[in-house]
Structure formats: structure tokens, C-alpha cells
Amino acid sequence: MVIVEDSNSGYEFFSEVSKEKTFEVVSAKGKSNIFKKINEYEKNKILIIADGAAFGAEMDGIVKKIRENNSIAMYLPESFEWLILKSDLINSNKVKNILEEPSDYVESKDYMSWERFFTALLVEETKDTYLRYSKSNLNSAYKNEKIMNKILKEVPEELLD
């Protein structure tokens, strides 16, 4: 069982991945609902995938739950958009430089979170390409097996087995 925080593109992506695997994907429909979803599926082996950039306040209760139940694991990339940027799908020195030192580029007066910054960066870098990104609806290019595998290289392999 994979519980994703996201109900948009990240959820669509991991749902597509699950078609080739032996796990089910459900959306928590927001970080504040993850704990409820864990309780709903706690008899299963669970992987939680959530945006580390925005997870903060929800962490304490979930960490306690993980300590009580060793069949729960957590993967917290900065955001789904960060995963895509990190995958090298976008061959850009600008993106590589930003990913090396994001704090040098993220301006807090412009972006409420790193997730929003990485979303804006991904949208900008893909706007006139076949990889055009929209947070609300995953472009079918990201459902291509080669592209999915490239993105999944950023996810620890043992988590998705």
C-alpha cells in the first residue's frame, strides 16, 4: 500500500507506476489526512510518499506510528516536482545548479514553500516542450515507461518492492 499526500500529478504518477507493481496507491488528499489513512490501512505494509518541503507539523504523530509499526516506511522528497527535476529529464545547467544549492535561489518573499518554487521552476523549464508540466493534470509523457523509470531512479528501490 502506498499512501501519497498528493491528489494531483504525484498521485497520478504513482498510480501509473502501481500498474506494473503489486501495490495499491491511495491519495491522502493532503498532508493533514495522512495519519487517518495510516490508521485505515495499518494492517498492510505501507509506504508514505509526501512532500518533505511541506510536511513539518504532521511529522510527530506519524513518526510515533512508524516506531510502533515496523511495516510503515516513509519517503519524503522535497516535492514531486523536485523528483522530476532531479531525474535529469530536463537537460539544463540552470536546473542542475539550482538543485545543488536550492537555498541560494529560493526567495521566501516570492515562494511560500520550496514545493511552490520547484513547481514554478518545472513549469517554466518544460513550458514549450513535450514534457510540459501541470500540477493539476499529469502530462501523458510522464506516464511513458522510460520517463517513469528515470524519475523512479530517485526513489530508493527497496521502497517500491
Roles of regions detected by a PLM:
Residues M1-D161:
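Acidic, divalent-metal-binding catalytic cores of TOPRIM
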